[in-house]
């Protein structure tokens, strides 16, 4: 692998991508990626896709409803047409990010269940506002029963 001569220069690079709740997300430079062959980049792509599938398995193993909750909230997050600056939506976003980071609805260290910062009414209205066919509930299931069971 060729060493990029610019690596020796002090560059300003923001390693912190985002902070929320008690978490800080970092990113890193991957020197030499541009010099990889197309075949090597393709391998990295397929490994990343395998990791995403493994992530779903981990979510499922960490809790019976984790995957369903994540997919439901992701649907609300991507399809919601309301005010995204509303405190309830902002809190839903933070809750979803915590779920992504911890691979489920429990804290990654303390194992405490996350408490949503949005109201049940907001979630109900948000779920009503999205196409029900996009929600991951399965045939004949209703989100109303699921929400009662999952968020108590």
Residue ranges, per PLM feature:
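Short, Lys/Arg-enriched N-terminal segments with co-localized hydrophobic residues
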Residues: 2-7
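N-terminal helix-rich structural modules
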Residues: 8-152
């Amino acid at each position: 692998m060729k060493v990029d001569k610019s690596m020796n220069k002090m560059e300003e690079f923001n390693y912190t991508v985002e902070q929320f709740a008690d978490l800080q997300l970092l990113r890193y430079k991957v020197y030499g990626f541009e010099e990889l062959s197309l075949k090597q980049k393709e391998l990295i792509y397929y490994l990343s896709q395998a990791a995403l599938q493994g992530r779903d398995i981990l979510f499922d193993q960490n809790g019976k409803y984790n995957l369903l909750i994540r997919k439901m909230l992701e649907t609300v997050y991507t399809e919601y047409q309301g005010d995204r600056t509303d405190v309830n939506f902002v809190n839903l976003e933070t809750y979803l990010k915590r779920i992504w980071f911890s691979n489920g609805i429990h804290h990654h260290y303390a194992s405490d269940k996350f408490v949503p910062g949005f109201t049940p009414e907001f979630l109900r209205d948000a779920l009503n506002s999205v196409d029900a066919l996009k929600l991951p509930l399965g045939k004949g299931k209703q989100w109303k029963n699921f929400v009662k069971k999952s968020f108590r």
